[in-house]
């Protein structure tokens, strides 16, 4: 409800900016759907207990599902001034078959709890990893949610997946909730043939791990290749750097990475002076030593030749778009960066082509190396 009210206020303040209003309306719609899902928790529990809950099997685009989840979570973590880290590992399949509504329900519930019980300034991290599978028709995914919150007492941890269970603690008495969310999540994960585990330490934080076998869609196509390019990836998170450079490698693009904006500038300038320039720079927006916008501005001042610079942000890029454009940034990507997201950005900002191949790019399957 806070997200709906907040986006409504923002839309009203930008009534003369159609793109901003449209974006707000999209987020209001997503949040409204989530609110309706929460209202239906009691009905879901009733269905589960009577054995009447069934799962739909539909073709889903994993990037779209994750984008919805991240969009919903952004309002919560921003309001609480928390850091929200989303990272991908070894994702080989993006088009899958499952009940997207129930998948979102489980992940949003766990993420919402993580944010709810983490103090301002804390961190919520969300890792999505595709792990090894012995069944060629299914992909195993591991979703890990960690927080630096208040933690869960051992006596409550034992009953966390039981219906109407809420910890009696002065630290959380003012926190709203039905006490059904985790019980429903556990039942849905069971129905999907997966597992959900939790570990916690009071005063340190909590970690949920969800493992799910998701059927691979037969609609996925073969590999997509780009011409010979060299790109540098800059992000203070080593995992993000390794993931993005691995995606680039899989589509035949040479790449380097740096975790520091200042060192990245030095590397870009050195390559340019040596006559072996980079074809593009992919920059994280938020870095501790020198943020992406500042790094882009320094590169632009030093190199006069065209050099595409793409900014990645864990949040809505509209917050920094004007400043970034003035600094010389060409385009934007939102974390987490999937293969299809990366290919579209390279197609548009590096190759300068219209998104004529978006249909093809949305159906990418990358073979395991």
Model-predicted regions and their roles:
Residues 46-57:
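Helix-loop junction within the histidine kinase core
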Residues 193-199:
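Glycine-rich ATP-binding loops of the HATPase_c
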Residues 79, 87, 139-142, 155, ...:
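Disordered, acidic interdomain junction associated with two-component signaling
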Residues 176, 181, 185:
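Short alpha-helical Gxxx[C/S/T] motif in the catalytic ATP-binding
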